[in-house]
């Protein structure tokens, strides 16, 4: 009987030692798992970055095509400032294409520690509704800003969105700035100021409105920056910490966020479209289109899809990195858009000049600076894992 108790005590002691000192194969598998997760993370970041650049490029191409065919370059005062509710609606209306993807992407099992489901649902509904109204306001103000001022002036003001993002993320998200992130911010602000594309929907020089209408772009920048920071907060404090999707950051979160927010924003823009009476002009817009009604519809559909591509990539970068990085990538697309517009359209006196070349180089350096910060962060995680492994061995 005594031998049996002694053997049990020995077995228990060996099991505890085994837990405290994992086998080499187990440590190796943990290291491989960390490396695999980091590789998956990098792939996700690069895919989202590509979606943002692709969406931005397609949007500026199709917007220029739309306003050229809509005879906006004729500077007809009666036509110049119409269609802003429609453009705002187009930015959000294509969200149904994401619904099949939402069900295709796997969803991890929720953690048993998830807080009260009913309370969580109420918080989510309030969050999505608030963000939807904010996005609708940004979409409307963004559409107005492009038409009420020169595009260069519009780009200069909209560059303040990064400044507002820095302010909001420092307050809301407690974001920590590193030396390389600050360098990236400075580079992208300079590049954004000199690398903007031409926009065919802007008014003639004698029609610039540098009054309250043009400065509405500031309000659009504030709404855009605030929405990004609130999205990051919702990922960190609601969808991740409540264990609704387990303990992981998964792409399904991005799709859920975009579908719900865009649906609310679309309803708001649709109400604005009918309340303003702008819907009555839709038939005239299609008939006035140079290429005909078919191309009119196709251009709007293309714009709607392009906006969704851009938004999914943007929110994905917020999830995997931060709202600051997401905004920097969006602004890095400006010199690239200028290059694409020069190739696709034959605007008078528009070329890819030396300032734009410098802006393109600056954008690449800005991305490189931020990527270096991300590389150092992942490397630090690996070093900390190795240190913990050495402590276990000792």
UniProtKB/Swiss-Prot annotation:
The record's keywords, sorted A to Z, are: Membrane, Phosphoprotein, Transmembrane, Transmembrane helix, Transport
Q: Where is this region: Disordered?
A: 1-24
Q: Where in the cell is it found?
A: Membrane
Any one Pfam family here would be PUNUT
The portions of this protein that span the membrane are: 43-63, 85-105, 124-144, 152-172, 180-200, 211-231, 254-274, 301-321, 328-348, 352-372
Any one GO cellular component localisation term in the record: membrane
InterPro entries associated with the record: PUP_plant (IPR030182)
Stretches of Basic and acidic residues bias are at: 1-20
Record family assignment = Belongs to the purine permeases (TC 2.A.7.14) family.
Q: What protein am I looking at?
A: Probable purine permease 23
What is the species of this protein? Arabidopsis thaliana
